[in-house]
Amino acid sequence: KLIFDEFIIRPSEIEEDIPSAINYELAAEYLASKKANSVVKKSNELVIGCDTVVTAGNIILGKPHDCKECRKMLRLLSGRTHSVYTGVSIIFNGKEFCFTEKTDVKFRNISDEEIEEYMNTGEPFDKAGGYGIQGRGALFVQSICGDYFNVVGLPVSRLNYELKKIVL
């Protein structure tokens, strides 16, 4: 709603597997492109696909499948800086334009008790890296360098800038 007053959400049914040959910095863009291309119906429509991945070092952290995986992710992020990459694919008039936005997030040290309490909310299981900065996951954040909305999952300022170049 920040960019468009009206839009239609078409969920993608793609498998979110990332080929091992893809650089972790481009993984989100790869998935965003797959999503956008899977839902485009007409050549003259505007389609925006996006995907977010979290990396700790060279390790890509997707959405945790269970408590064990979530616990491992949050322990890995505890007390460290990690990177959040959101890839965006814009399809317009049969052409595709892609970009990736990066934001660095530093977590404070998180206790095992805090991790268990957070997992019990159910919040972390549908989010890359096992946390949502827009929810209770914000309680773990010590600092952020970059676009907050990128960590939420859509870098709206950059998207607006890129759309103006493409559509106008």
Name these PLM-found stretches.
Residues 1-10, 166-168:
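N-terminal G-site helix/loop of the GST-like fold
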Residues 22-168:
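Anionic-ligand binding patches
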Residues 1-2, 19, 41-42:
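Short loop/helix-cap segments at secondary-structure boundaries that form the rim of catalytic
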Residues 5-19, 96-102:
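Short glycine-rich, Thr/Ser-proximal phosphate-binding strand/loop in the N-terminal lobe
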